């Protein structure tokens, strides 16, 4: 696929828009206010390596255009001073920024090993 992944570059934008345009109407039908279980819309996940505000804003705009009206969120890994702090306001900012972290140095590739 042409274009840098997780960006607003045209090749990738065409691909993610096609996907969102099929998935978002399904999510919209299943929102909490319409009798479904969906209470949040996670626009991205651990997006601290790229900070393309146009990409994040486009994802949110497409969600709203599809009728998604629950709060929009995203989460950053390890509170790395990334999306939630860098983009707290302005284009691409989400309503509920979140942070995730892995307890006790847990690594998915070594699930039997835990740090102190």
Can you name each region flagged by the protein language model?
Residues 46-69, 76-115:
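Substrate-binding cleft/loops of secretory-pathway carbohydrate-active enzymes
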